[in-house]
Amino acid sequence: MSKISSDQVRSIVSQLFKEAQESKRGFLETVELQINLKNYDTKKDKRFSGQIKIGTVTKPKLSVCVFADQQHCDEATKIGAEFMDIEALKKIGPKNKKAIKKLSKKYDAFLASESILRQVPKLLGPGLNKVGKFPTLLTHSEDMASKINDVKSTVKFQLKKVLCLAVAVGHIELTEREVATNIIQSINFLVSLLKKGWQNIKTLYVKTSMGPSHRVY
């Protein structure tokens, strides 16, 4: 049972859009959902992790890199996607923590060809997994551009050591209805991941990149 109404969320989103239009900043503002949890012990309780694909791109400028086999290297070149082949990954190596950290900061998400995905732990160690950026499988039957778009439309929740999370759920070039739908879908999915559902949620806020926070719950 959801504890927030769609009317309430739409009204808040309307306010966000109004503020963003009045301020007219020189870049595309992202809409962010900020979550504070309670009654959760990150040392004892299982740290949840999950992702949901929503109806629109949440962050158009989200950067994606493909760990590509030869066929995917050719496809990435054709569509202008960023990629690294197996030789480039071997050059980094699993012990070069500094380079792996730099790679994980440079890109928001990773895709990998099947033959390379299996080797990622051996090639790069556990670094990408630790920061919640382990690559998603890209098969040869999938269209690379569509798959990259799917990644840009995915909201990921991963609890680390602190009881607060922030995720992008849209941007101000979407319609108000689209952003409101994304927020509701994301919240309901998050609740399904939590041990005690709504009882684990302390507060929920939404805000644009530079705007004030608005409390949803």
From Swiss-Prot:
GO terms of molecular function: RNA binding; structural constituent of ribosome
Gene3D superfamilies the record matches: 3.30.190.20, 3.40.50.790
Residues annotated with N6-methyllysine modification: K122
Xref: CDD domains: Ribosomal_L1
GO biological process: translation
Domain of life of the native organism: Eukaryota
Residue list for modification N6,N6-dimethyllysine: K122
UniProt cross-references to Pfam families, sorted A to Z: Ribosomal_L1 (PF00687)
UniProt GO cellular component terms: cytosolic large ribosomal subunit
Keyword vocabulary terms for this entry: Methylation, Ribonucleoprotein, Ribosomal protein
Family membership: Belongs to the universal ribosomal protein uL1 family.
This protein's name: Large ribosomal subunit protein uL1
Annotated source species: Dictyostelium discoideum
